[in-house]
A protein has these predicted regions:
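Core catalytic region of metal-dependent phosphoesterases/phosphodiesterases
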Residues: 3-5, 10-116
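Conserved beta-sheet core of the metallophosphoesterase superfamily
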Residues: 107-110, 114-139
Length: 139
């Protein structure tokens, strides 16, 4: 079975609801730490997916500043992985390339799509997977 997710943003503290009520941060994820958030994301994915399933990650796994950490976190995911790169993933790849880890990162995936989208067939449906908005002017 195929599953789809986007904007995981492993390790992004700015996404957490600020415990101090600081209005400058507009995080919406209800975790006390990025470690708790990362663990819950992994737990939820693994509770839903099996090793026979494919998880399409439609952009934004992490940020450039925690690119190395994303490798160890992705290794905990059970399903096969396909990455359609989003805007933050380009920085992740660049940071990993600078450290000689790009190949290690990409080896965790069945496919890495560096373009803007991927067209797949899932059952009777054709799906255009893209991290970016798509407008269909024909309808």
């Amino acid at each position: 079975m195929n599953y789809y997710i986007s904007d995981i943003h492993f390790g992004n503290e700015a996404l957490l609801i600020p415990p101090d009520g600081n209005e400058a941060r507009k995080g919406t994820r209800p975790f006390s730490s990025v470690e708790e958030m990362n663990e819950k994301i992994i737990e939820n994915i693994n509770d839903c997916c099996t090793a026979e399933d494919t998880l399409y990650i439609i952009g934004d796994i992490a940020q450039f500043y925690n690119a190395e950490e994303s490798i160890s976190l992705l290794k905990h995911l059970v399903p096969k992985l396909v990455l359609i790169m989003g805007n933050h993933d380009k920085g992740v790849i660049a940071a990993l390339k600078a450290k000689g880890l790009e190949v290690t990162f990409k080896s965790l995936f069945e496919r890495v799509i560096s373009g803007d989208s991927l067209l797949i067939r899932d059952g009777k449906y054709d799906l255009l997977l893209s991290h970016y908005p798509v407008v269909n002017l024909a309808t």
